[in-house]
A protein has these predicted regions:
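Polyanionic/metal-chelating signatures
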Residues: 10-161, 169
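Aromatic/His-enriched, Gly/Pro-containing loop or helix-boundary segments
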Residues: 1-7
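Catalytic core of soluble alpha/beta enzymes
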Residues: 143-144, 164-184
Length: 184
C-alpha cells in the first residue's frame, strides 16, 4: 500500500494489479485484484466485484522447498497426493457446512456449527466457483496432472503461471479454458 513502485507503475500505464502470495506451497494463499491508487489500506484499493484467487504451486518449487527440509511433498507424486488429500478434506468440510445450513433454526440452536477453518473456507470457495485458481507450474506433465485433479474435484483452473512448457499442451489448455501467464 505504501510501496513507491505504485506511482512508478502508474506512470507506465499500469492501472491495476493482481497480487498473489509466493509459489513454494501446494496451497499458498489468497490473491486480490486492486486498483493502482494511493490509499492507506488494501481494502480501499480492491477492484470492485473482482473475485479473490488462490495461488497454488506444483512441481519444482514445493518439491525443492520441502525436499530440502526432508518433508513431504518432496516428489511430484507427493504434490498430487497432497492436493488430493486437501480437496477431500475440503469436500468434507463443505458437506458438513451444507448439512448444518439445511437444518431448521430450532435444530441449529441445539447443535454447534462446524468449527471455522480458514484454509477449508478458501478451498470450499474454490469448489463453489467463488475463488479463482492460479497455479504455478513449469512442466506440461504437471499442468496436465493439475487439470486432472481439477476435473476430479470439479473446480476450474483460471491460469497457469510460469508455464514454460504450456506450448506442448496448448490444445488441452484451450479445451479447458485455461490461460497462461508467462514471462515475456
Amino acid at each position: 500500500v505504501q510501496d513507491p513502485q505504485y506511482s512508478l507503475a502508474l506512470k507506465g500505464g499500469v492501472t491495476s494489479f493482481h497480487i498473489l502470495p509466493g509459489s513454494a506451497n501446494l496451497i499458498g494463499g489468497r490473491g486480490v485484484t486492486v486498483k493502482n491508487l494511493q490509499r492507506n489500506t488494501i481494502n480501499s484499493m480492491k477492484f470492485p466485484k473482482a473475485p479473490h484467487s488462490l495461488k497454488m504451486a506444483c512441481g519444482e518449487n514445493p518439491k525443492r522447498v520441502y525436499g530440502n527440509r526432508g518433508q513431504a511433498p518432496s516428489t511430484r507424486m507427493g504434490n498430487a497426493a497432497g492436493y488430493r488429500k486437501s480437496w477431500i478434506q475440503a469436500e468434507g468440510y463443505l458437506r458438513r457446512l451444507n448439512e448444518y445450513e439445511e437444518k431448521s433454526d430450532e435444530a441449529k440452536e441445539l447443535e454447534y456449527a462446524p468449527t471455522r477453518d480458514l484454509e477449508m473456507e478458501t478451498l470450499t470457495g474454490v469448489l463453489k466457483g467463488e475463488i479463482l485458481v492460479h497455479n504455478h507450474c513449469y512442466r506440461a506433465d504437471e499442468m496436465a496432472t493439475m487439470i486432472d485433479i481439477a476435473k476430479e474435484f470439479n473446480y476450474k483452473i483460471t491460469a497457469f503461471h510460469h508455464g514454460v512448457e504450456a506450448y506442448k499442451i496448448a490444445d488441452l489448455l484451450a479445451d479447458n479454458g485455461i490461460c497462461g501467464a508467462l514471462w515475456a
